[in-house]
Regions:
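Generic beta-sheet signal
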Residues: 98, 190-192, 210
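A contiguous pocket-lining binding segment that forms or flanks enzyme active sites
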Residues: 148-150, 155-200
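Conserved inter-motif catalytic segment of the P-loop NTP-binding fold
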Residues: 91-158, 162
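A conserved mid-domain beta-alpha-beta active-site/ligand-binding segment of alpha/beta enzyme cores
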Residues: 219-237
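Glycine-rich, charge-decorated loop segments at or immediately adjacent to ligand/cofactor-binding or catalytic sites
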Residues: 105-112, 194-211
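Acidic, Ser/Thr-rich peripheral helices and adjacent loops at domain boundaries
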Residues: 116, 203-224
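C-terminal regions of RecA-like/P-loop NTPase motor modules
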Residues: 1, 236-283
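Detector for small/aliphatic-rich hydrophobic stretches
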Residues: 1-97, 101, 114, 118-123, ...
Length: 283
């Protein structure tokens, strides 16, 4: 697809929530508009870099340190979106995940059992696949512009837009357009990129992510997902670097204390079920 069918989106949201489609949106104009929500990540050191919290109505950028780290960046973006969704105007609404069709075949797609293990209910994700990066950006803007007067924030709790490579369409102007749309919609957008780029961006925060060793949970079994995260840009605070462990039970980041235990690698949640094991990337 090259855009978002808003009527279909409303029907899907209604199905997920089990609400009457008339009643779900009847009183939107009377609730929550004009409210800006901030959120935290859960790791004290990282949260301290944002004195007023991370903006819940802004564009945040996450990119892989190198092409082999794309799966780690995907997991980080997923966790980031889950944290942001908790503070959304309608936190129970789905997160829209928009990606290029080529990304699933190259890196693997989001896998329901893996999402469960990550602490994310797969039914909360509406996955949209688009032919090109230009279509991904258009679909993201369509989702943010659903309805008028900020009503998108009553349809979804966040948007992740994933692009591969360094498409020319994703320039400073395009990112500014996304930022303005997030502010109007009162929704967070996480722009996930497979490659680092020197192109300027309007994102209020910019994260460079790579996989890090996890603590074994026992019997040399994989532990919780761990990320090496570098905050390269922070419009509302300071920058820094942290080793961040994702807790799938509490759905928050924490410090990765090694405790002298064996460190092991583990597959990321976005590994596709239909790809040979030899092609699956791990963190």
């Amino acid at each position: 697809v090259s855009g978002i069918d808003i009527a279909a989106l409303r029907r899907m949201v209604t199905t997920i929530e089990g609400n009457d489609p008339q009643g779900s949106f009847a009183n939107q104009g009377q609730t929550d508009f004009g409210r800006t929500r901030s959120f935290t990540l859960g790791l004290a050191g990282a949260d301290a870099a944002f004195p007023h919290g991370l903006a819940g109505d802004a564009l945040h950028e996450v990119f892989a340190e190198n092409p082999g780290a794309h799966m780690a960046a995907t997991g980080f973006a997923l966790a980031f979106a889950a944290r942001a969704a908790e503070r959304a105007i309608e936190p129970r609404r789905p997160i829209i995940w928009i990606e290029e069709e080529s990304a699933a075949s190259e890196y693997g797609g989001l896998y329901p059992p893996g999402l469960h293990a990550f602490g994310i209910d797969p039914s909360r994700l509406l996955i949209v696949r688009c032919p090109t990066a230009q279509d991904v950006l258009k679909a993201a803007n369509d989702a943010l512009e659903a309805g008028t007067g900020g009503k998108a924030s009553h349809l979804v709790s966040g948007v992740v837009a994933s692009v591969t490579g360094q498409p020319k369409c994703l320039d400073l102007t395009a990112s500014r357009r996304l930022l303005l749309a997030t502010e109007t919609a009162q929704l967070p957008v996480i722009l996930l990129r497979s490659h680092r780029t020197a192109v300027q961006s309007a994102a209020v925060s910019r994260w460079r992510v790579a996989p890090a060793p996890s603590r074994s949970s026992g019997a040399n079994a994989p532990g919780k997902p761990v990320f090496s995260a570098v905050l390269e840009r922070n419009r509302h605070g300071t920058c820094g670097q942290w080793i961040m462990e994702w807790n799938n039970e509490t759905q928050e980041f924490g410090a990765n204390e090694r405790d002298g235990r064996t460190s092991v690698s583990r597959p990321l949640v976005s590994v596709s079920a239909d790809r040979p094991a030899s092609q699956q990337r791990s963190a």
